[in-house]
Amino acid sequence: MTRVKRGYVARKRRKRVLQLTQGFRGAHSVLFRTANQQNIKALRYASRDRARRKRDFRRLWITRINAGARKQGLSYSQLMHRFKKCGILINRKVLAQLALLDTKTFNQLVFYTDL
């Protein structure tokens, strides 16, 4: 069998991996084998953390809504129950922004649930 020279194909593949790992520390951005391993690991972390980011933001929003609700003498769960009972369908992201930046509107929403 004749020898196959795949010079530019291999170089292109290695170059692509090394470009993806630019900015990594030490050999992780210089040596192909370690760079390839770190690239695989980085992609795994990225996919895991996309789901984790959604979780973290939801926790942050709930904490902010709870702080706003406590100022009104309610717990988070009581407030959300009142919203559902009154048919107020505002998502947690917007409620958290209202509780943090526009407390007057947030307080009016809470007052509306008392009626």
Curated annotation (Swiss-Prot):
Q: Which GO terms describe its cellular component?
A: chloroplast; ribonucleoprotein complex; ribosome
| CDD domains in alphabetical order | Ribosomal_L20 (cd07026)
The protein's matches in Pfam families, at most eight in alphabetical order, are given as: Ribosomal_L20 (PF00453)
Compartments annotated for it: namely:
Plastid, Chloroplast
Recorded GO molecular functions are:
rRNA binding; structural constituent of ribosome
The record's section on InterPro entries has: Ribosomal_bL20, RIBOSOMAL_L20_CS, Ribosomal_protein_bL20_C
The processes (GO biological process) annotated in the record are:
ribosomal large subunit assembly; translation
- Chief place where the protein resides: plastid
Q: PROSITE patterns from the xrefs?
A: RIBOSOMAL_L20
What's its job?
Binds directly to 23S ribosomal RNA and is necessary for the in vitro assembly process of the 50S ribosomal subunit. It is not involved in the protein synthesizing functions of that subunit.
- Which family is annotated? Belongs to the bacterial ribosomal protein bL20 family.
| NCBIfam families according to UniProt | rplT_bact
Protein's name according to its UniProt entry:
Large ribosomal subunit protein bL20c
